Amino acid sequence: GNPITLSGKVILPAKGPIKRYILVSHYTIASNAEAPSNIFSLEGLLVKLGYALIIPDYLGYGVTADHIHPYLVMDLTARNVLDMYLAVVPFLEAAGYAPEYDDIYLMGYSQGGATTMAVQHLIEHHGDYNIKIRRVFAGGGPYDVKATYDRFVETNYTSLPCAVPIMMQGMIVGNKLDVDMSKMMSPSLYANLDEWVNSKRYTTSQIDALIGSNTTSDLLSSIGMDRTSREVSELYKAMTQNSILTYSWKPQAPVFIMHSIDDDVVPYENATRAKSKWQGANIQYNLGHFGGHVKAFIRFIYTVQTLLINEEKEEEGNYDF
Protein backbone atom coordinates (compact mmCIF):
# COMPACT_ATOMS: atom_id res chain seq x y z
CA GLY A 1 0.00 0.00 0.00
CA ASN A 2 0.92 3.66 0.09
CA PRO A 3 3.22 4.82 2.91
CA ILE A 4 1.56 6.90 5.61
CA THR A 5 2.99 9.01 8.44
CA LEU A 6 1.77 8.13 11.94
CA SER A 7 2.18 9.95 15.25
CA GLY A 8 2.48 9.11 18.92
CA LYS A 9 4.09 10.12 22.19
CA VAL A 10 7.24 9.19 24.09
CA ILE A 11 7.30 9.81 27.86
CA LEU A 12 10.77 9.83 29.44
CA PRO A 13 11.74 9.81 33.13
CA ALA A 14 12.61 13.29 34.43
CA LYS A 15 15.96 12.07 35.75
CA GLY A 16 18.12 9.01 36.16
CA PRO A 17 18.78 6.15 33.75
CA ILE A 18 16.00 4.49 31.72
CA LYS A 19 15.47 0.91 32.85
CA ARG A 20 13.49 -0.38 29.88
CA TYR A 21 11.08 0.68 27.19
CA ILE A 22 7.38 -0.04 27.65
CA LEU A 23 5.51 -0.18 24.34
CA VAL A 24 1.88 0.74 25.03
CA SER A 25 -1.14 -0.07 22.82
CA HIS A 26 -3.84 2.44 23.73
CA TYR A 27 -7.42 1.75 24.78
CA THR A 28 -10.58 2.60 22.81
CA ILE A 29 -10.98 6.30 22.10
CA ALA A 30 -13.28 8.26 19.80
CA SER A 31 -12.15 11.91 19.81
CA ASN A 32 -8.79 12.99 18.46
CA ALA A 33 -8.33 15.00 21.67
CA GLU A 34 -7.95 11.62 23.45
CA ALA A 35 -5.15 10.40 21.16
CA PRO A 36 -1.94 9.61 23.08
CA SER A 37 -0.07 12.41 21.28
CA ASN A 38 -2.66 14.91 22.58
CA ILE A 39 -3.08 13.85 26.22
CA PHE A 40 -1.18 12.30 29.13
CA SER A 41 -2.19 8.63 29.03
CA LEU A 42 -2.84 6.96 32.38
CA GLU A 43 -0.14 4.40 31.59
CA GLY A 44 2.28 7.34 31.80
CA LEU A 45 2.22 6.95 35.59
CA LEU A 46 4.77 4.15 35.16
CA VAL A 47 7.40 6.65 34.00
CA LYS A 48 8.12 7.49 37.65
CA LEU A 49 9.55 3.97 38.07
CA GLY A 50 12.26 4.81 35.53
CA TYR A 51 10.69 3.40 32.35
CA ALA A 52 10.36 5.19 29.02
CA LEU A 53 6.91 4.78 27.50
CA ILE A 54 6.36 4.64 23.74
CA ILE A 55 2.66 5.19 22.98
CA PRO A 56 1.65 5.26 19.30
CA ASP A 57 -1.50 6.82 17.92
CA TYR A 58 -3.38 4.27 15.86
CA LEU A 59 -4.23 5.00 12.22
CA GLY A 60 -7.19 7.40 12.35
CA TYR A 61 -5.84 9.50 15.24
CA GLY A 62 -3.14 12.11 15.70
CA VAL A 63 -1.78 13.24 12.32
CA THR A 64 -4.07 10.76 10.52
CA ALA A 65 -7.31 11.93 12.19
CA ASP A 66 -8.87 12.48 8.76
CA HIS A 67 -8.78 8.69 8.17
CA ILE A 68 -11.39 6.23 9.43
CA HIS A 69 -9.90 4.19 12.27
CA PRO A 70 -9.89 0.46 11.34
CA TYR A 71 -11.10 -0.50 14.82
CA LEU A 72 -9.98 -3.98 15.97
CA VAL A 73 -8.34 -4.80 12.64
CA MET A 74 -5.58 -6.56 14.55
CA ASP A 75 -2.61 -7.02 12.22
CA LEU A 76 -2.89 -3.48 10.87
CA THR A 77 -3.12 -1.87 14.31
CA ALA A 78 -0.32 -4.06 15.70
CA ARG A 79 1.80 -2.95 12.75
CA ASN A 80 1.10 0.73 13.62
CA VAL A 81 2.37 0.07 17.16
CA LEU A 82 5.46 -1.85 16.10
CA ASP A 83 6.35 0.65 13.37
CA MET A 84 6.48 3.47 15.91
CA TYR A 85 8.74 1.42 18.17
CA LEU A 86 11.09 0.61 15.27
CA ALA A 87 11.19 4.29 14.23
CA VAL A 88 11.59 5.78 17.71
CA VAL A 89 14.20 3.51 19.30
CA PRO A 90 17.17 4.45 17.04
CA PHE A 91 16.27 8.12 17.56
CA LEU A 92 16.11 7.73 21.37
CA GLU A 93 19.38 5.79 21.50
CA ALA A 94 21.15 8.36 19.32
CA ALA A 95 19.87 11.10 21.64
CA GLY A 96 21.35 9.34 24.69
CA TYR A 97 18.17 7.68 25.95
CA ALA A 98 19.20 4.05 25.57
CA PRO A 99 17.78 1.83 28.34
CA GLU A 100 19.88 -0.23 30.75
CA TYR A 101 18.27 -3.46 29.49
CA ASP A 102 17.53 -4.38 25.89
CA ASP A 103 14.35 -6.40 26.48
CA ILE A 104 11.00 -4.58 26.44
CA TYR A 105 7.58 -4.71 28.03
CA LEU A 106 4.37 -4.68 26.01
CA MET A 107 1.23 -3.30 27.62
CA GLY A 108 -2.38 -2.51 26.77
CA TYR A 109 -5.92 -2.44 28.14
CA SER A 110 -9.28 -2.89 26.39
CA GLN A 111 -8.69 -2.46 22.64
CA GLY A 112 -5.04 -2.14 23.67
CA GLY A 113 -5.18 -5.49 25.49
CA ALA A 114 -6.03 -7.35 22.29
CA THR A 115 -3.67 -5.16 20.25
CA THR A 116 -0.72 -5.78 22.58
CA MET A 117 -1.23 -9.55 22.14
CA ALA A 118 -1.27 -8.97 18.36
CA VAL A 119 2.00 -7.03 18.71
CA GLN A 120 3.48 -9.97 20.61
CA HIS A 121 2.31 -12.28 17.81
CA LEU A 122 3.85 -10.01 15.18
CA ILE A 123 7.22 -9.95 16.97
CA GLU A 124 7.28 -13.69 17.74
CA HIS A 125 5.80 -14.92 14.47
CA HIS A 126 8.17 -12.82 12.37
CA GLY A 127 11.37 -13.36 14.32
CA ASP A 128 13.53 -11.08 12.17
CA TYR A 129 12.81 -7.99 14.30
CA ASN A 130 15.34 -9.05 16.93
CA ILE A 131 13.12 -7.65 19.70
CA LYS A 132 13.26 -9.39 23.08
CA ILE A 133 10.03 -9.26 25.06
CA ARG A 134 10.50 -9.42 28.82
CA ARG A 135 6.79 -9.60 29.65
CA VAL A 136 3.39 -8.65 28.25
CA PHE A 137 0.63 -7.01 30.33
CA ALA A 138 -2.84 -7.33 28.78
CA GLY A 139 -6.07 -6.26 30.46
CA GLY A 140 -9.76 -6.36 29.55
CA GLY A 141 -9.08 -7.23 25.92
CA PRO A 142 -11.48 -8.38 23.18
CA TYR A 143 -9.34 -11.35 22.16
CA ASP A 144 -12.42 -12.84 20.48
CA VAL A 145 -13.91 -9.93 18.51
CA LYS A 146 -16.88 -11.92 17.20
CA ALA A 147 -17.89 -13.10 20.70
CA THR A 148 -17.68 -9.51 21.95
CA TYR A 149 -19.89 -8.15 19.16
CA ASP A 150 -22.19 -11.17 19.42
CA ARG A 151 -22.96 -10.19 23.01
CA PHE A 152 -24.39 -6.86 21.81
CA VAL A 153 -26.79 -8.70 19.50
CA GLU A 154 -27.62 -11.65 21.79
CA THR A 155 -28.51 -9.52 24.80
CA ASN A 156 -29.86 -6.59 22.72
CA TYR A 157 -27.90 -4.37 25.11
CA THR A 158 -24.62 -2.48 25.10
CA SER A 159 -23.16 -0.41 27.93
CA LEU A 160 -20.94 1.33 25.34
CA PRO A 161 -23.29 2.18 22.42
CA CYS A 162 -20.57 3.92 20.40
CA ALA A 163 -18.68 0.59 20.18
CA VAL A 164 -21.36 -0.83 17.86
CA PRO A 165 -20.90 1.61 14.93
CA ILE A 166 -17.15 2.01 15.57
CA MET A 167 -16.65 -1.77 15.48
CA MET A 168 -18.92 -2.31 12.47
CA GLN A 169 -17.35 0.50 10.44
CA GLY A 170 -13.80 -0.47 11.46
CA MET A 171 -14.30 -4.05 10.27
CA ILE A 172 -16.01 -3.07 7.00
CA VAL A 173 -13.56 -0.31 6.04
CA GLY A 174 -10.43 -1.93 7.49
CA ASN A 175 -11.10 -5.24 5.72
CA LYS A 176 -12.49 -3.61 2.53
CA LEU A 177 -15.71 -5.63 2.80
CA ASP A 178 -18.31 -5.36 0.05
CA VAL A 179 -21.05 -4.54 2.54
CA ASP A 180 -23.46 -1.58 2.58
CA MET A 181 -23.38 -0.12 6.10
CA SER A 182 -26.56 1.86 5.49
CA LYS A 183 -28.44 -1.45 5.34
CA MET A 184 -27.04 -2.54 8.71
CA MET A 185 -27.40 0.55 10.91
CA SER A 186 -30.55 2.36 11.97
CA PRO A 187 -31.28 5.32 9.62
CA SER A 188 -30.54 7.94 12.29
CA LEU A 189 -27.24 6.34 13.35
CA TYR A 190 -26.06 5.98 9.76
CA ALA A 191 -27.10 9.56 8.94
CA ASN A 192 -25.01 10.88 11.86
CA LEU A 193 -22.02 8.52 11.53
CA ASP A 194 -19.69 11.06 9.91
CA GLU A 195 -20.51 13.80 12.42
CA TRP A 196 -20.60 11.69 15.58
CA VAL A 197 -17.79 9.20 14.88
CA ASN A 198 -15.68 10.22 11.89
CA SER A 199 -15.34 13.91 12.79
CA LYS A 200 -13.28 12.75 15.83
CA ARG A 201 -14.83 15.64 17.77
CA TYR A 202 -16.64 13.57 20.37
CA THR A 203 -15.44 11.27 23.16
CA THR A 204 -16.94 7.81 23.62
CA SER A 205 -19.24 9.06 26.40
CA GLN A 206 -20.36 12.03 24.28
CA ILE A 207 -21.20 9.72 21.36
CA ASP A 208 -23.11 7.45 23.75
CA ALA A 209 -25.16 10.47 24.84
CA LEU A 210 -25.81 11.48 21.21
CA ILE A 211 -26.93 7.93 20.36
CA GLY A 212 -29.20 8.04 23.39
CA SER A 213 -29.94 4.32 23.72
CA ASN A 214 -28.28 1.20 25.12
CA THR A 215 -30.63 -1.08 23.15
CA THR A 216 -28.76 -2.67 20.24
CA SER A 217 -31.88 -2.90 18.04
CA ASP A 218 -32.18 0.91 18.27
CA LEU A 219 -28.72 1.15 16.70
CA LEU A 220 -28.96 -1.59 14.08
CA SER A 221 -31.48 -2.38 11.36
CA SER A 222 -33.29 -5.73 11.18
CA ILE A 223 -30.58 -6.86 8.71
CA GLY A 224 -27.85 -5.77 11.14
CA MET A 225 -29.52 -7.74 13.95
CA ASP A 226 -29.99 -10.85 11.78
CA ARG A 227 -26.97 -13.10 12.20
CA THR A 228 -28.04 -15.16 9.17
CA SER A 229 -28.03 -12.17 6.78
CA ARG A 230 -25.29 -11.99 4.12
CA GLU A 231 -24.07 -8.67 5.52
CA VAL A 232 -23.69 -9.92 9.10
CA SER A 233 -22.07 -13.19 8.01
CA GLU A 234 -19.44 -11.17 6.07
CA LEU A 235 -18.93 -9.01 9.14
CA TYR A 236 -18.56 -12.07 11.38
CA LYS A 237 -16.06 -13.62 8.99
CA ALA A 238 -13.90 -10.49 9.24
CA MET A 239 -14.28 -10.40 13.04
CA THR A 240 -13.16 -14.03 13.29
CA GLN A 241 -10.08 -13.31 11.14
CA ASN A 242 -9.24 -10.37 13.42
CA SER A 243 -9.57 -12.31 16.66
CA ILE A 244 -6.15 -13.10 18.11
CA LEU A 245 -7.56 -16.38 19.47
CA THR A 246 -8.09 -17.72 15.92
CA TYR A 247 -4.36 -17.41 15.12
CA SER A 248 -2.41 -20.67 15.04
CA TRP A 249 0.00 -19.28 17.62
CA LYS A 250 0.72 -19.56 21.30
CA PRO A 251 2.47 -16.72 23.21
CA GLN A 252 6.15 -17.48 23.87
CA ALA A 253 7.18 -14.61 26.17
CA PRO A 254 5.59 -14.46 29.65
CA VAL A 255 2.15 -12.81 29.73
CA PHE A 256 0.01 -11.32 32.50
CA ILE A 257 -3.71 -11.24 31.64
CA MET A 258 -6.17 -9.39 33.87
CA HIS A 259 -9.95 -9.28 33.36
CA SER A 260 -12.85 -8.38 35.60
CA ILE A 261 -15.67 -10.92 35.84
CA ASP A 262 -17.96 -7.87 36.10
CA ASP A 263 -16.66 -6.24 32.88
CA ASP A 264 -19.62 -4.40 31.34
CA VAL A 265 -17.96 -3.62 28.00
CA VAL A 266 -15.65 -6.50 27.01
CA PRO A 267 -17.25 -9.78 28.16
CA TYR A 268 -15.28 -11.85 30.67
CA GLU A 269 -15.55 -14.85 28.33
CA ASN A 270 -12.72 -13.26 26.31
CA ALA A 271 -10.38 -14.17 29.19
CA THR A 272 -11.79 -17.67 29.68
CA ARG A 273 -11.48 -18.36 25.95
CA ALA A 274 -7.88 -17.11 26.04
CA LYS A 275 -7.17 -19.43 28.97
CA SER A 276 -8.62 -22.38 27.07
CA LYS A 277 -6.82 -21.57 23.78
CA TRP A 278 -3.40 -20.77 25.24
CA GLN A 279 -3.04 -23.74 27.58
CA GLY A 280 0.60 -24.49 28.31
CA ALA A 281 1.78 -20.93 27.59
CA ASN A 282 3.59 -18.95 30.31
CA ILE A 283 0.56 -16.85 31.27
CA GLN A 284 -0.42 -15.59 34.70
CA TYR A 285 -4.14 -14.82 34.99
CA ASN A 286 -5.63 -12.33 37.41
CA LEU A 287 -9.39 -12.81 37.12
CA GLY A 288 -11.81 -11.53 39.73
CA HIS A 289 -14.61 -9.15 40.65
CA PHE A 290 -12.79 -5.89 39.93
CA GLY A 291 -15.84 -3.84 38.95
CA GLY A 292 -16.80 -2.55 35.50
CA HIS A 293 -14.48 -2.01 32.54
CA VAL A 294 -13.25 1.46 33.53
CA LYS A 295 -12.83 0.72 37.24
CA ALA A 296 -10.86 -2.42 36.37
CA PHE A 297 -8.56 -0.32 34.14
CA ILE A 298 -7.43 1.74 37.15
CA ARG A 299 -6.75 -1.47 39.04
CA PHE A 300 -4.85 -2.85 36.02
CA ILE A 301 -2.48 0.16 35.96
CA TYR A 302 -1.68 -0.15 39.66
CA THR A 303 -1.33 -3.94 39.42
CA VAL A 304 1.20 -3.56 36.59
CA GLN A 305 3.04 -0.97 38.68
CA THR A 306 3.27 -3.46 41.58
CA LEU A 307 4.44 -6.26 39.26
CA LEU A 308 7.16 -4.02 37.81
CA ILE A 309 8.38 -3.05 41.29
CA ASN A 310 8.48 -6.72 42.33
CA GLU A 311 10.37 -7.71 39.17
CA GLU A 312 12.95 -5.02 39.91
CA LYS A 313 13.45 -6.39 43.42
CA GLU A 314 14.04 -9.87 42.01
CA GLU A 315 16.47 -8.49 39.44
CA GLU A 316 18.45 -6.71 42.13
CA GLY A 317 18.20 -9.58 44.60
CA ASN A 318 16.29 -7.48 47.15
CA TYR A 319 13.67 -9.97 48.20
CA ASP A 320 11.03 -9.19 50.79
CA PHE A 321 10.72 -12.11 53.21
Predicted segments with their positions:
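Short beta-strand/loop motif that positions the catalytic acidic residue
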Residues: 251, 256-263
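Acidic catalytic loop of the alpha/beta-hydrolase fold
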Residues: 145, 261-266
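Short substrate-entry loop that stabilizes the transition state in hydrolases
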Residues: 15-19, 24-54, 59-65, 265
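Gly/Ala-rich beta-loop-alpha elbow adjacent to hydrolase catalytic centers
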Residues: 108-112, 116, 263
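N-terminal cap/lid segment of alpha/beta-hydrolase-fold proteins
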Residues: 1-20
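C-terminal catalytic histidine-bearing segment of alpha/beta-hydrolase fold enzymes
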Residues: 231, 235-242, 265, 269-321
